[in-house]
């Protein structure tokens, strides 16, 4: 084994010289230089500096403006709540531990940090799945006369929290466990060992199938069908410029949504799966740290993709920030009018942009 396994930790370095110490008790500067921990802390501070205001603003603006309190926006708000979970449950903890160079908060802190970070990520992931299904049902109309109501939105919210907890809670209850990973100043699921009594293998397989592969398949299916529906509507109205514009708008949104999903999850999932299937192989502390912390940037681009590209929300946000006035009102108004025209045109072909 090219690492050192101890009680509730795994350090990716062989302890041939006796230098390896518990990541709960000693600085891990033998893994990487103190400067690397400082850079990690600075990166997390940047995510908090940007992620907290934009997600808090999303919640505040929606509460402030009644016209934004639509069933679909309930799911979008759930994304903001998930991102705030990551900010408070994971990012603040990592800043503190990276300042010390090890997981100074002990096993209880590791369990809490791992749980809240996993919960926030999973709520966000399953919120995207609910959004994809909603778009498919409303736009492609596999169920005739379906209307996404407040009850559907509430069921979607409950579903995301149930699924998120079905992934984040088991390691607290003995099915797998949370341990420090990478540079040993943040915690995640134990992909690294087959520790007796924790059944890590079965949990990791369950997590990858139910909490990665299935969501990925659902998102691709729903947005693939959405793209086909928009193209069919545009083909039926070859001379309609507004329909073509609507097709481009929906296509752009779909592409950005799928790319955001893949960019966030595939690097982390790929590295985690590699470590799980190659336990005992040699890898450095940065091998898991880089994709794990890159995935945390979802707290920034989630609201940008799913909310800030919404013209109505953008108008309300500017109005809130500018004390009730929108200095770009004429431009925003023209843009909103064009958007309504496009939506109306495409709606006649049973398609509506996001």
Swiss-Prot record:
Record topological domains on the Extracellular side: 1-36, 97-110, 174-202, 275-286
Topological domain spans for side Cytoplasmic: 62-73, 134-152, 225-252, 309-354
Membrane-topology annotation of the record: Multi-pass membrane protein
The UniProt record lists the keyword Magnesium: no
UniProt xrefs under Pfam families: 7tm_1, Rhodopsin_N
Record InterPro entries: GPCR_opsins, GPCR_Rhodpsn, GPCR_Rhodpsn_7TM, Opsin, Retinal_BS, Rhodopsin, Rhodopsin_N
Sequence intervals crossing the membrane: 37-61, 74-96, 111-133, 153-173, 203-224, 253-274, 287-308
GO cellular component: membrane; photoreceptor disc membrane; plasma membrane
Biased segments, Low complexity type: 334-354
Lipidation (S-palmitoyl cysteine): 322-323
Subcellular location: Membrane; Cell projection, Cilium, Photoreceptor outer segment
Gene Ontology process terms (BP): absorption of visible light; G protein-coupled opsin signaling pathway; visual perception
Site (Plays an important role in the conformation switch to the active conformation) residue list: 113
Disulfide bonds: 110-187
UniProt keyword annotation of Glycoprotein present: yes
Start and end residues of each stretch annotated as Disordered: 333-354
PTM (free text): Phosphorylated on some or all of the serine and threonine residues present in the C-terminal region. Contains one covalently linked retinal chromophore.
Alphabetical UniProt keywords: Cell projection, Chromophore, Disulfide bond, G-protein coupled receptor, Glycoprotein, Lipoprotein, Membrane, Palmitate, Phosphoprotein, Photoreceptor protein, Receptor, Retinal protein, Sensory transduction, Transducer, Transmembrane, Transmembrane helix, Vision
Glycosylated position list: 2, 15
Role, per record: Photoreceptor required for image-forming vision at low light intensity. While most salt water fish species use retinal as chromophore, most freshwater fish use 3-dehydroretinal, or a mixture of retinal and 3-dehydroretinal. Light-induced isomerization of 11-cis to all-trans retinal triggers a conformational change that activates signaling via G-proteins. Subsequent receptor phosphorylation mediates displacement of the bound G-protein alpha subunit by arrestin and terminates signaling.
Family: Belongs to the G-protein coupled receptor 1 family. Opsin subfamily.
Protein name: Rhodopsin
Species this chain originates from: Poecilia reticulata
Gene name as annotated: rho
């Amino acid at each position: 084994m090219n690492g050192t396994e101890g009680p509730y930790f795994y350090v990716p370095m062989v302890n041939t010289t006796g230098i390896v110490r518990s990541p709960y008790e000693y600085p891990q500067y033998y893994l990487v230089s103190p400067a690397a921990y400082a850079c990690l802390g600075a990166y997390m501070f940047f995510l908090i500096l940007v992620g907290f205001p934009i997600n808090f603003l999303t919640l505040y603006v929606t509460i402030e403006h009644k016209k934004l309190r639509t069933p679909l926006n309930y799911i979008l708000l759930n994304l903001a709540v998930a991102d705030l979970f990551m900010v408070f449950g994971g990012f603040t903890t990592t800043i503190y531990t990276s300042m010390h160079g090890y997981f100074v908060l002990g096993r209880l802190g590791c369990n809490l940090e791992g749980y809240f970070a996993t919960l926030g990520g999973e709520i966000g992931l399953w919120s995207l799945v609910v959004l994809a299904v909603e778009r498919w049902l409303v736009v492609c109309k596999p169920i005739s006369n379906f209307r996404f109501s407040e009850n559907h939105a509430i069921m979607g919210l409950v579903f995301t929290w149930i699924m998120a907890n079905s992934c984040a809670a088991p390691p607290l209850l003995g099915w797998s466990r949370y341990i420090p990973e990478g540079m040993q100043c943040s915690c995640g699921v134990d992909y690294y060992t087959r520790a007796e009594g924790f059944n890590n293998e079965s949990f990791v397989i369950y997590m990858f199938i139910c909490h990665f592969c299935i969501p990925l398949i659902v998102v691709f299916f729903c947005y693939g069908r959405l793209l086909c529906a928009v193209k069919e509507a545009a083909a039926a109205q070859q001379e309609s410029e507004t329909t073509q514009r609507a097709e481009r708008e929906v296509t752009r949104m779909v592409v950005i949504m799928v790319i955001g999903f893949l960019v966030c999850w595939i690097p982390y999932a790929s590295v985690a799966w590699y470590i799980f299937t190659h336990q005992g192989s040699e890898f450095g502390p940065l091998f898991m740290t880089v994709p794990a912390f890159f995935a945390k940037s979802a707290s920034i681009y989630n609201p940008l993709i799913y909310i800030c590209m919404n013209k109505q929300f953008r108008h309300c946000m500017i109005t809130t920030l500018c004390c009730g006035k929108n200095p770009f009102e004429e431009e925003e108004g023209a843009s909103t009018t064009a958007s309504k025209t496009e939506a109306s045109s495409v709606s006649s072909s049973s398609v509506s942009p996001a």
